[in-house]
Curated annotation (Swiss-Prot):
Subunit structure and binding partners: Homodimer.
Keyword Lyase: yes
Gene Ontology molecular function: carbohydrate derivative binding; carbon-oxygen lyase activity; ether hydrolase activity
Record key words, sorted: Carbohydrate metabolism, Lyase
Annotated gene: murQ
Boundaries of every SIS domain copy: 56-219
Catalytic activity: N-acetyl-D-muramate 6-phosphate + H2O = N-acetyl-D-glucosamine 6-phosphate + (R)-lactate
E.C. numbers: 4.2.1.126
Similarity annotation: Belongs to the GCKR-like family. MurNAc-6-P etherase subfamily.
Active-site residue numbers: 84, 115
InterPro entries, A to Z: Etherase_MurQ, Glucokinase_regulatory_CS, MURQ/GCKR, SIS_dom, SIS_dom_sf
Name the UniProt record assigns to this protein: N-acetylmuramic acid 6-phosphate etherase
UniProt KW DNA-binding keyword: no
Length: 297
């Protein structure tokens, strides 16, 4: 039998014992007060997040991937963060990957027993052709999900880097990772509902890992997402605005270079900043490893 009594995420919150008796306003205030604790809890583990980001940058530079593994809410958050990297940073969907126990179906409905399988976590990475250049980040609020542990153990066999993210101290998955992150947000507002504070903490940390690792491989210039992919009308206009912000050019100039660059925002910026044609701009970016700033030297 699994003993959940030692897990912070399963403890009852002293502040919400009478939750069912609260008015809507009282419950809102209590919930908001609990949520305020999350960012401070994340702040405590920044030193543990830093090496994970460094490892992700190293993986990308070797042609490897960042692979999120989780079940339930943890898995869904990984899939969400991975999916957002494609339009935001212009990376292929294969570079940041989110895997959830039970597969795509588990994004919307619970898949019975999927998270309890060590073998399933292993098999999902085999199917992904895991390599030693990859970084596997196992996510589990409880810190004990077998699916995640199976994945981390297989990653060790292959020689891939291993990180973990849990919301309990002394988590089991931490023993299976080189770079463990244990963020303690205290008991949930609703006992055991880890989609709340734990999920929020996980989302904040995944945001940090994906965003800052992308900065580390040249996907950002100043604080602008210069590799954004203009896949809809809103993003086309945002792309032109980014070009204007990066170069202090007019809308008309931004639009002209955007089109000359075949809607490549980063290339258009380099063309404007260095006064060059598209082909020369491409060469400059290759030599600069994709960093806009390095094309200006």
């Amino acid at each position: 039998m699994i003993d959940l009594s030692t897990l912070t995420t399963e403890r009852r919150n002293d502040e919400t014992f009478n939750l069912d008796q609260m008015t809507v306003k009282e419950a809102l205030v209590k919930m908001n007060n609990e949520d305020k604790k999350v960012a401070y809890a994340v702040e405590e583990v920044l030193p543990n997040i830093e090496p994970v980001i460094s490892s992700a940058i190293e993986a990308f530079n070797k042609g490897g991937r960042l692979i999120y593994m989780g079940a339930g809410t943890s898995g869904r958050l990984g899939v969400l963060d991975a999916a957002e990297c494609v339009p935001t940073f212009g990376v292929p969907a294969t570079q940041v990957v989110g895997l959830i126990a039970g597969g795509d179906k588990a994004m919307t409905v619970a898949v019975e027993g999927a998270e309890d399988s060590l073998e399933l976590g292993r098999q999902d990475l085999i199917d992904l052709n895991l390599s030693e250049n990859d970084l596997v980040l196992g996510i589990a609020a409880s810190g004990r999900t077998p699916y995640v542990i199976g994945a981390l153990d297989y990653a060790k066999e292959i020689g891939a880097k291993r990180a973990s993210l849990s919301c309990n101290l002394n988590a089991e998955i931490s023993k299976h990772a080189e770079f463990p992150i244990e963020v303690d947000c205290g008991p949930e507002f609703l006992t055991g509902s880890t989609r709340l504070k734990s999920g929020t903490a996980q989302k904040l940390i995944l945001n940090m890992i994906s965003t800052i690792s992308m900065i580390g491989i040249g996907k950002v210039y100043n604080n602008l997402m210069v590799d954004v992919k203009p896949t809809n009308e809103k993003l086309v206009e945002r792309s032109k605005r980014i070009i204007m912000q990066a170069t202090d050019c007019t809308y008309e100039e931004a639009e002209e270079k955007f089109n000359e660059a075949n809607q490549d925002v980063k290339l258009a910026i380099v063309m404007l900043l260095t006064d060059c044609a598209a082909e020369e701009g491409k060469t400059k970016l290759v030599k600069a490893n994709g960093f806009v700033k390095n094309t200006l030297n």
